[in-house]
């Protein structure tokens, strides 16, 4: 086999490894008709129909806590956190439990959509006014929906 072909194959393999390193899975969800995504590496589980215990003297967006197998987890309502009006809960509302740098937190969302593969090199800087929660955005290939990327590290620093 000529050396030129081997070099080409090696270059293609390196490019594939580089491209794979930039790809990440994201769990997408809707809140107030906005599509958000969170890196799947943070996701512990998705909970439906779990009772919340409210807490006094907390911001409105902290809906309360849950006891999940003996662990107390604070729950943040993303809708309220981004300044949207509160909504009635229905059967599609669920809690996504996240583990961010060893801290578990739950986010209350309108509905979970799907898992998508994202090329993180294609993420653009967020133009959203409340950048405390959004670190970037990307146009998805499934019809042009724009996904806002949730900045988990910033979110837990405020709880």
Mark where each language-model region is.
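An acidic, low-aromatic, low-complexity terminal/linker signal
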Residues: 1-159
């Amino acid at each position: 086999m000529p050396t030129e072909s081997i070099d080409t194959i090696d270059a293609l393999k390196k490019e594939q490894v580089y491209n794979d390193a930039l790809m990440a899975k994201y769990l997408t969800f809707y809140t107030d008709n906005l599509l958000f995504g969170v890196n799947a590496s943070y996701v512990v589980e998705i909970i439906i129909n779990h009772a919340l215990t409210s807490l006094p003297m907390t911001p409105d967006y902290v809906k309360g806590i849950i006891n999940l197998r003996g662990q107390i987890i604070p729950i943040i309502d993303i809708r309220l956190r981004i300044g949207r009006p509160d909504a009635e809960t229905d059967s599609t509302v669920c809690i996504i439990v996240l583990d961010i740098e060893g801290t578990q937190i739950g986010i209350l969302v309108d509905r979970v959509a799907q898992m998508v593969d994202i090329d993180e090199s294609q993420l653009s800087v967020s133009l959203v006014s409340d950048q405390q929660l959004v670190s970037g955005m990307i146009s998805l290939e499934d019809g042009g929906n724009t996904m806002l990327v949730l900045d988990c590290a910033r979110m837990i620093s405020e709880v």
